[in-house]
Curated annotation (Swiss-Prot):
Biased composition (Gly residues): 88-99
Protein's recorded name: E3 ubiquitin-protein ligase EL5
Effect of residue 163 to A: Reduces E3 ubiquitin ligase activity
UniProt biased composition (Low complexity): 15-28, 268-281
EC number: 2.3.2.27
Transmembrane as UniProt keyword: yes
Gene name in the database record: EL5.1
Segments passing through the bilayer: 38-58
Length: 325
């Protein structure tokens, strides 16, 4: 039995040895797994360290820039970076152009004082513990700096900054309110009333008469002008010739022609004394010529006048007889 066990012992040893791994291959696999894990952990640590370093550098840069702006604003020299003029003419709040230079120079420039600004804010029931910040350069106003406070909205800025801004804009940088109040439109011009006036002219100028007065009245109604000539009637007693002349308009024309001709004859006789006649025969010739001219004028008027009633015809003949006499 012992022998059987001894015989079975080697068999069992062989089976166990065949089933268990070799001691040389196990440490090699463990070493390979350990190297890969170490590389992964190292890569993660390197990336995390790089991100942390970048964040720290960015924070330091922002702090340094903020500190530099604060230092330059309190030093009094080169205290603010000048705002760059925009290439556009209007910007967001512009109206196509800046403020007129004359208006810009008329805006008041004051020396800023924090105590004065705090007192003014207290009177207006406003809390202004942080002071006034210029919206153009994003820096606070310090004591002794020149500042402009816009008249309409009351916002304050550095004088240089707001002058540069208003050179290309016409509104406040904060509230976009126009700096200058636009002028009110002009009221419409009322239409002129119709003109009416009276001009008195002597009748001798208008009709060649010397014993009457005439009035010329110009009246404007609905945009049209009308000339009215008024000839007053004579206060003397009327004669049959005047009655006949009133009954017929052609006789009135004839009288006008006769008087015009007589005035022209008197003017010609007065201007040239050498043409005056010394004999009675010459006077007779002048009377004949006068009668012929009057007859021709009467015929011309009768031809131009339409048919008249018998009474008017008789009056015209009577007037013609008087004229010839």
């Amino acid at each position: 039995m012992v022998r059987g066990v001894e015989q079975g012992g080697p068999a069992m040893d062989e089976s166990s040895s065949s089933s268990s791994p070799s001691p040389v291959s196990a440490p090699a696999g463990q070493a390979a797994m350990t190297a890969g894990g170490i590389a992964t952990v190292a890569a993660v640590l390197i990336v995390f360290a790089a991100l942390t370093l970048a964040f720290v550098l960015l924070q330091c840069y922002c702090d340094e820039r903020r500190r530099a702006v604060t230092t330059t604003s309190t030093s009094g020299r080169g205290r603010r970076p000048r705002p760059r003029r925009r290439s556009g003419s209007g910007g967001d709040g512009g109206t196509g152009g800046g403020v007129d230079p004359e208006v810009l120079r008329s805006l008041p420039v004051t020396v800023y004082s924090r105590s004065t600004a705090a007192a003014a804010a207290k009177e207006e029931e406003e809390e202004d513990d942080d002071g006034v910040e210029c919206a153009v350069c994003l820096a606070e106003l310090e004591d002794g700096e020149e500042a402009r406070f816009l008249p309409r909205c009351g916002h304050g800025f550095h004088a240089e900054c707001v002058d540069m801004w208003l050179g290309s804009h016409s509104t406040c940088p904060l509230c976009r309110l126009t700096v200058v109040v636009p002028p009110p439109p002009l009221p419409p011009v009322p239409p002129e009333p119709p003109a009416s006036y009276t001009v008195s002219l002597p009748a001798s100028v208008l009709l060649g008469l010397s014993d009457h007065g005439a009035g010329a009245v110009t009246m404007t109604a609905e945009g049209r002008s009308t000339l009215v000539i008024e000839i007053p009637e004579s206060a003397a007693s009327t004669t049959p010739r005047d009655a006949a002349a009133r009954s017929s308009p052609s006789l009135a024309r004839l009288r006008s022609l006769r008087r015009l001709w007589s005035f022209g004859r008197q003017g010609a006789a007065g201007s040239t004394s050498s043409c005056s006649c010394a004999t009675g025969g010459d006077n007779d010739d002048g009377d004949v010529e006068h009668g012929v001219s009057v007859t021709v004028a009467i015929r011309a008027v009768e031809a131009a006048t339409p048919a008249r009633p018998p009474e008017a015809e008789a009056g015209a003949r009577t007037a013609a007889a008087h004229v010839r006499n």
